[in-house]
Amino acid sequence: MVLVGYFVLVISIKDLVTHKIRNRTLLYFLSSLIAFSLFSQNAHVNPFAGACFFTIFTVLYLLSNALHKSGGIGFGDVKLIGVLAFAYFDSGLRSVEIFFVSLWLALVAHICLHLLICRKFPYRIAMAPDIFLASGLYLYAPIGLLLPQ
């Protein structure tokens, strides 16, 4: 858990500063999650969920860049969601729906905080902290929604 917290901090701070998520950092994060799942009995890895979330968010990435020339979701964010889905999420439409709602709640909170602090609408948003927050909300959701996890 400490290792995951380390990667959450490193990736979030780097994304807040540079608006980029390095592939090398994501590979180290994925490797540590795989190693953790091999040595832990209660960890589950779902490659299908990782591929499913990665595909859905890749389509969103392509649509957002095709419809809005200044960009939308970054591909580093798509890869981060794929890595987190590989380790923590379930596959299925209900899981995608819960993660979407969690991500939108985190993004709205991020934008509102930015508006309150800076008094202007942000041109670009570092989404890594919001993705990690949405993942936490997603993992907490089955308790309230009685979903299998």
Model-derived regions: residue spans:
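A membrane-topology feature that recognizes alpha-helical transmembrane segments
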Residues: 1-149
